[in-house]
Design a protein with these regions (language model features):
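Alpha-helical residues within the helix-turn-helix
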Residues: 21, 32, 43, 57, ...
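Short amphipathic recognition helices of helix-turn-helix/homeodomain-type DNA-binding modules
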Residues: 69-86
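DNA-binding alpha-helical recognition surfaces that contact promoter or target DNA
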Residues: 18, 43, 72
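Short alpha-helical DNA-recognition segment
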Residues: 25-43
Length: 86
């Protein structure tokens, strides 16, 4: 185990939540810009669903943040969870 507690492992949805706050963008606006359902976005924001590559690409368009950033966040999260579970 890496010494990380579960609470220290940050899901990409937390970062997305912060980005939305910083851009003063509502979830409803994100739904309109991405064409993704409110249910899916809420699930990502709550850390219940992982961020898919296709959603990352839609975020790139909607937020002007490269899809690679979101994919890398998800990959890092997945790796940390695996390490935590060892």
């Amino acid at each position: 185990m890496t010494g990380l507690s579960r609470e220290m492992i940050i899901h990409p949805g937390e970062t997305l939540k912060e980005v939305l706050e910083n851009k003063n963008m509502t979830q409803k606006e994100l739904v309109l810009k991405t064409g993704v359902s409110t249910k899916y976005i809420n699930s990502v924001l709550r850390g219940e669903k992982n961020m898919s590559a296709s959603f990352a690409k839609k975020l790139e368009y909607a937020l002007n943040i490269e899809a690679e950033f979101w994919v890398n966040l998800q990959n890092a999260y997945d790796k940390e969870i695996l390490e935590y579970q060892k």
